[in-house]
Amino acid sequence: MMRFSKIIFLAFLFAISCLTVPLFAETAPVSARKDNRIRFVNYDPYNVTQIIGSIRSSVQLEFADDEEVTYVGIGNSVAWQVAPAGHFVFLKPREVQPVTNLQIVTSRQDGTKRSYQFELQVREGDVSAGNDTYFLVKFRYPEDEALRKKLAKAAEAAQREENFVNDVFNIHENFGPRNWAYEAQGSSLIEPASVYDNGKTTTFTFLGNTEIPAIYLVSLDGQESLVPKSIKGNKVIVHAIAAQFTLRRGNDVLCIFNKRFVPEGINPETGTTSPSVQRRVNIGNGHEG
């Protein structure tokens, strides 16, 4: 009975020792497919990365492109030579000595920092492929890559939505409600073939290779001003509506009058010039979308 109790007690002590004694192990970088001297490792600030250098060869550490090495600390500067350069660090073992450590801190463009821990080992012998030696250790950043993909996906979705909205506006520009009630007075040499508006923009159409005149918006007090416009083929789309426009080319002058001018434009009850695109007000952040 006493012997059985002793066995149970020893087993209990062993179990407790397994729970209370932590296990330490460095991370060995993964070999590249074509050459085992090229290595890759995922960044983890709480991992120690193993580096094996060989006499008469150097090891290159490569961090993210947006990082710059700002601090390097090494346990044995006699056995190892360290040379930081931008987001790289070059290591050269000088002599075979016991294992030591290397600590590197980098600064990123967004102001944050990253910390790296290394265990350095030196070996002698052949440095050709197939031997246990490192030439390049490149860090990978899965979280950064996942974030880049997420942002790229969101940007693509936003672009698709913008393209869809533009397509809808173009449809209603071409096929939506129009005001054709315009009259012209002045030189027929610069008279457009047609003029209409959709409540937001005014479109002037010219024939053939006609030299397009300057188009001025005339305010209610008679002042003329140039306004933004787009040219699509033989059409000039002025990004405004007005009671009067004045066209000028050299000595030729033509006045265009909007006989059905409505200052607020066409209202399709959506807050835009398209009945298919609605304007949304976000109360929470005080912005309109």
Curated annotation (Swiss-Prot):
Residues 1-25 form the signal peptide. The keyword Signal applies. GO terms for cellular component: periplasmic space. It comes from the Bacteria. Residues 267-289 are annotated as: Disordered. Residues 269-279 have a biased composition (Polar residues). It is found in: Periplasm. Interacts with virB8, virB10, virB11 and the 15 kDa protein that is encoded within the VirB locus. Belongs to the TrbG/VirB9 family. Component of the type IV secretion system VirB/VirD4 which could be a major virulence determinant for subversion of human endothelial cell (HEC) function. This is Type IV secretion system protein virB9. The gene is virB9.
